[in-house]
């Protein structure tokens, strides 16, 4: 599976299929008042209250017949390794729920992660690490593509500017390919 990331300056909220929102331990969504979703805040809060007691990192529910919300519970003071693990478990969650396209909003990320500017890079780095699969010798290859749209209206997010994460992904995937390759006997 591959992950395609697009930075968008302008987005039509009605065309967004799946919203990904980060929230605290109590599922309080930061930056919610700046989003298009604030119109349906009472329904969203009711769904959160119904599922609040469940010890899950992610909540998925429908807003209407064509749109879903995925809430990601993030604890304060996460280290970069924990952010990567959260991204990896999020990848596993969306893959198991067949959610292949979703949108992340900078207003949500900006208010929630003002201390760690690299949070989104670390989170998506974990997703990319988890998405690796060795299918060189498979006859039926998995061609699913995860599409992530990052709405960056205020140019707050410097996503992708740090090439360290891309270099790590390439090196780790090459190493995994070499380890998975059968030996020459």
Tell where the protein language model's regions lie, with residue ranges.
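Short amphipathic alpha-helical segment within the helicase RecA-like ATPase core
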Residues: 1-185
């Amino acid at each position: 599976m591959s992950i395609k990331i697009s930075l968008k300056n302008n987005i039509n909220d009605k065309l967004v299929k799946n919203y990904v929102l980060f929230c605290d331990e109590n599922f309080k969504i930061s930056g919610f008042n700046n989003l298009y979703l604030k119109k349906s805040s009472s329904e969203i809060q009711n769904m959160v209250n119904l599922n609040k007691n469940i010890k899950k990192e992610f909540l998925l529910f429908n807003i209407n017949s064509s749109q879903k919300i995925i809430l990601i519970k993030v604890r304060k003071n996460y280290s970069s390794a924990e952010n990567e693990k959260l991204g990896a478990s999020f990848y596993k969650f969306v893959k198991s729920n067949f959610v292949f396209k979703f949108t992340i909003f900078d207003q949500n990320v900006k208010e929630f992660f003002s201390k760690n500017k690299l949070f989104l890079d670390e989170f998506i780095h974990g997703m990319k690490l988890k998405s690796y699969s060795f299918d060189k010798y498979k006859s039926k290859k998995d061609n699913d593509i995860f599409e992530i749209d990052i709405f960056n209206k205020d140019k707050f997010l410097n996503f992708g500017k740090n090439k360290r994460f891309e270099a790590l992904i390439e090196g780790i995937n090459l190493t995994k390919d070499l380890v998975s390759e059968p030996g020459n006997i």
